[in-house]
From Swiss-Prot:
It comes from Schizosaccharomyces pombe (strain 972 / ATCC 24843) (Fission yeast). It is an enzyme of class 1 (oxidoreductase). This is Sphingolipid C4-hydroxylase sur2. Keywords: Endoplasmic reticulum, Lipid biosynthesis, Lipid metabolism, Membrane, Oxidoreductase, Transmembrane, Transmembrane helix. Belongs to the sterol desaturase family.
Length: 293
C-alpha cells in the first residue's frame, strides 16, 4: 500500500502529471519568447502582429503576467494533489488480465471479427480505447471551457470583474496564455482539466499526456506565430490565428472555443473564420508598396 506521502514524493505518473504541465509551459514560452526577441526574418514572416504592438496594445507589465501565471500553476498543483489524495495511488495495471477481459468481450459479442482479425482485442486495448478516451477528454474540456468562457463574456459584471484580466493582452503572446483572474484560472483551466480527466477515466499515465498536451496547446494558441509545419496548428483548426481573432475588438464575441476544436462555435453561431492576411502581413505589404512608390 503506497501512502500519500510516498505518492507525492517519488517520481511516478501522479507526480509527473503535476509537474510536466508547469515545465512544458515555461519551456514553450521561453522558446517563443526567444523567437520574438531575436526577430529573425525567417521566423518574422510568420508573425500575426508586428512586434511593437505587444508593447503598445497590451496593458500588463510582463512581471505581472509572470506572477499571475505562477499563482495559477500553484493552484493547479494544489488541486492536483487534493485529487490525488482523494483517488489514492492507482493499483498497477495487470495487462494480461486486461487482455483476457478484452478477448472475452470479443469472443462473446464479436466472434466473427475475432476470427478474421485475431489481433482486434490487442488493437482495441492499446490504441482504439485510449484514442476514444483522449477524444472524449478533449470534447469534455472544450465543452466546459466554451460555455464558461461564453458566459463570462455575456455577463458584463463577471466580465469586468474576472475575464477582463485576460483581455488586457490584446496581442496574445506565449507567456501570457495563462494570464487570468485566479477565479477564472481555477474554474476554466484547473477544474475543466480535472473534470475531463475524471469523465474520460484516464489513467495517471494518460493524464500526463493529456495535461501536458492541453498546456502546450494553450501556449501555442497564444504564441503569436502561424508556422506552416506546427503540428498543433496543422491538425487543429482552433489555433493561434483562430484564437487571436477573439482577442481583437472585432472578434470579441466570437471564437469562444478552446483549446482543441471549433465545434461549439460552429454549432452555436459564434464562429469567425481567420482572415486571409494577418496584421503583420498587411504591414509588410504596405512597407513594400511605399518602397516601390
Amino acid at each position: 500500500m503506497v501512502t500519500t506521502v510516498e505518492m507525492l514524493t517519488t517520481w511516478n505518473p501522479v507526480t509527473v502529471s503535476l509537474v510536466s504541465p508547469v515545465i512544458i509551459y515555461w519551456v514553450a514560452s521561453a522558446f517563443f519568447g526567444f523567437l520574438h526577441y531575436i526577430e529573425l526574418p525567417v521566423f518574422e514572416k510568420y508573425r500575426i502582429h508586428p512586434p511593437e504592438e505587444i508593447a503598445r496594445r497590451n496593458r500588463v507589465p510582463q512581471m505581472a503576467v509572470v506572477k499571475a501565471v505562477l499563482f495559477q500553476q500553484l493552484c493547479e498543483v494544489v488541486v492536483g494533489i487534493a485529487l490525488a489524495m482523494f483517488e489514492g495511488y492507482p493499483e498497477p495495471i495487470d495487462e494480461a488480465k486486461q487482455m483476457l477481459r478484452y478477448e472475452a468481450f470479443f469472443s462473446k459479442n464479436l466472434p466473427a471479427l475475432l476470427q478474421v482479425a485475431p489481433f482486434a482485442p490487442k488493437l482495441a486495448y492499446n490504441f482504439i480505447v485510449p484514442a476514444f478516451q483522449y477524444f472524449f477528454a478533449f470534447f469534455i474540456i472544450d465543452s466546459w471551457q466554451y460555455f464558461w468562457h461564453r458566459y463570462l463574456h455575456y455577463n458584463k459584471k463577471l466580465y469586468n470583474m474576472i475575464h477582463a484580466h485576460h483581455h488586457r493582452l490584446q496581442v496574445p503572446y506565449a507567456m501570457g496564455a495563462l494570464y487570468n483572474h485566479p477565479f477564472e484560472g481555477l474554474i476554466l483551466d484547473t477544474f475543466g482539466a480535472g473534470v475531463a480527466y475524471l469523465a474520460a477515466g484516464l489513467s495517471p499515465q494518460q493524464a500526463v499526456i493529456f495535461f501536458t498536451l492541453s498546456t502546450l496547446k494553450t501556449v501555442d494558441d497564444h504564441c503569436g506565430y502561424v508556422f506552416p509545419y506546427d503540428p498543433l496548428q496543422m491538425f487543429f483548426a482552433n489555433n493561434a490565428r483562430y484564437h487571436d481573432l477573439h482577442h481583437q475588438p472585432y472578434g470579441f464575441q466570437k471564437n469562444f472555443s478552446q483549446p482543441f476544436f471549433t465545434f461549439w462555435d460552429h454549432v452555436l453561431g459564434t464562429y469567425m473564420p481567420p482572415k486571409s492576411e494577418t496584421p503583420y502581413e498587411k504591414k509588410q505589404k504596405a512597407k513594400n508598396a511605399k518602397k516601390v512608390n
